[in-house]
Amino acid sequence: MTKQFAVIGNPIEQSRSPELHHAFAEKLGIELNYSKRLAPLDGFEANVKTFFDQGGLGINVTVPFKEQAFAMCHQLTERAKIAKAVNTLWIENGQLHGDNTDGQGLVDAIQALNWPLQGTRILILGAGGATRGVIYPLVQAGVTEIVIANRTQQRAEQLVQDLAGSVSEATLRVMTLDQLHGNFDLVINATSASLSGDALVLPETLQFKYAYEMAYGKPSSFLDQAKARGVPTTEGFGMLVGQAIEAFSIWHGVKPNLTDFL
């Protein structure tokens, strides 16, 4: 019987997970079926239970259910505990296990570009769930200082307070989006500001060597401004592939090569 996997979200049509997992499986000679499942906003838990009860082996979770998935799990990886969100589910010894592969996906994508992380100083724009999910893996990869910039400084300060004990190897600081300044190795945009048409201005007081846009496939004023400075830039497709590869390796015990799929 073909192994069954799925991605659950709402909306779900835009998900590229099935195409990625089928590509990984084909490359590695693994037979599987990976489907998209649209869950009603009040029906996520029932959807997960039904899928596993019917013999499904693994689920990826996308917007808006990652926090619900986190709350459902009996066992969590360290990075999922810190992220307080789960994007990868599986059953082991009768218990629901959860992981968050987003941050490792980002790290792997950056390393595939041969951009440095060890000993670097990084600025992340935004203090939402996307930022929370990537800080621990970035610190594990050797980043020594992370500054989180947000429109409301209080939210950034709360995030730093939440994470301080988990990432003691790195310095975490905050600033506001309208007071961006300093020298950084890398700037990561984890806000939707540059996509929604809101002005996200990168002032001359802010200097950086690389720019990463977490979103992909859409116009980005963040990337436009970085390109105008002549710094290397990329968008988030590599992170998408990286997090999918990490989930695939959890389920199948073998890790596809990221650069084969970029």
Curated annotation (Swiss-Prot):
NCBIfam families named in the record: aroE, PRK00258.1-2
Record-annotated active site: 66
Pfam families, sorted: SDH_C (PF18317), Shikimate_DH (PF01488), Shikimate_dh_N (PF08501)
UniProt superkingdom: Bacteria
Binding site for shikimate: 15-17, 62, 87, 102, 216
This protein's encoding gene: aroE
Swiss-Prot/TrEMBL GO biological process terms: amino acid biosynthetic process; aromatic amino acid family biosynthetic process; chorismate biosynthetic process; shikimate metabolic process
Keywords, alphabetical: Amino-acid biosynthesis, Aromatic amino acid biosynthesis, NADP, Oxidoreductase
Native source organism of the sequence: Acinetobacter baylyi (strain ATCC 33305 / BD413 / ADP1)
E.C. number(s) listed in UniProt: 1.1.1.25
Entry annotated with the keyword NADP: yes
This protein's pathway: Metabolic intermediate biosynthesis; chorismate biosynthesis; chorismate from D-erythrose 4-phosphate and phosphoenolpyruvate: step 4/7
A GO term, aspect molecular function: shikimate 3-dehydrogenase (NADP+) activity
Binding-site positions, NADP(+): 78, 126-130, 150-155, 214, 236
Name of the top EC class for this enzyme: oxidoreductase
Similarity-based family: Belongs to the shikimate dehydrogenase family.
Claim: Transcription regulation is one of the keywords in the record: no
Catalytic activity field: shikimate + NADP(+) = 3-dehydroshikimate + NADPH + H(+)
HAMAP family: Shikimate_DH_AroE
Entry function: Involved in the biosynthesis of the chorismate, which leads to the biosynthesis of aromatic amino acids. Catalyzes the reversible NADPH linked reduction of 3-dehydroshikimate (DHSA) to yield shikimate (SA).
PANTHER family: BIFUNCTIONAL 3-DEHYDROQUINATE DEHYDRATASE_SHIKIMATE DEHYDROGENASE, CHLOROPLASTIC, SHIKIMATE DEHYDROGENASE
Coiled-coil boundaries: none
One GO cellular component, as annotated: cytosol
The protein's name: Shikimate dehydrogenase (NADP(+))
